[in-house]
């Protein structure tokens, strides 16, 4: 009898508060019917206790769209026997973690789109150099509160049912859940409000997309898009169920506008990479084609790689044989982004932007990244560098050249952030390349190898001719005269 007291008390409270314990009639609310399981009566018991223990959390749920529509705690947290993280709590079998599998009971389309995305795969970094830096050069505690909070941890359940505190709490976008699913919806739709408005605001992305190696948030803020957003952020109708650019709002785009949200001719998507034609992450950028398999797994193939045909059985990168459902070329991916751009910009302006963007990426690739990468590879082959990562100064210099400075330049160009494209970008790339990378190559390689490498990969390019040839007397005089006229005589 004692167990049902909270149920009776909370039922009365909810009736007074006017919130439904079970889903209301769909036709009366002008919406599609909720699944039959929604509005489980067990949820009232949860609310009764947690209203006293975690009132703010319950208040957030009450204010959420799910709370208003009658979807309650037990609907999302219910577990089944055999679930790795299931445990009995006050007579109910529940799980703390709500995984994409759980969300998919109502939001299957969104989960299907997310399933093969780069977001879902963000936790698969165990073999990467970034992870080596975190785990070995830094240490596991730094990884737990740093890398994994964005990329996602592999949640481990200890004997007795508790989570390993080295892996939990965690809401990283690529979290590996106990039920085997990848991802965390709450990374963007923070519990327990689950707000579409919050997920559409740039700040939701800014938790992870910022800093010296991926400064999308900083680039966005200095761009015209970010300036417009700050000026008119309260006029974007972000809480609407549908959010179509040019229809529901016109004032300013957010990250979601370009990468996820609907246009009059294109549906919304939870695959944030679907409209991206370049990869700006590796040392050398390449355009990417996308292969979609019948199990909704996706993978990128660099431009120039032979593409499979629809219906063909191929071995994917993870070793599994899958049937090809669709192939998107990098041009088709770009067309999807161009469709978004055209909602606000004329065709000539969009074409000009992409021309400038492409040229910057090619400048970075050809003038700095390819020569530096080729030199590093030759030094490894000549055994001038050990195969152990990051044990020599030159490896750190090269790493930051592409991973920090090179990314900043490319991201700056991709989102119209001039300061990041130049001063935080190509300027820093050039400074590191000429004043650190080349001198360190000379020291590591020794002669005659250093001269051979630099002549082959660097000085043979017209863009590097100034390093050896310097400037003419006339060019120097022209610069000096400019500064004299602008700033006066300088002592």
Label every model-predicted segment:
Residues 1-4:
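Positively charged n-region of N-terminal signal peptides that target proteins for export
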Residues 148:
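Extracellular glycan/ECM-engagement signal in secreted proteins
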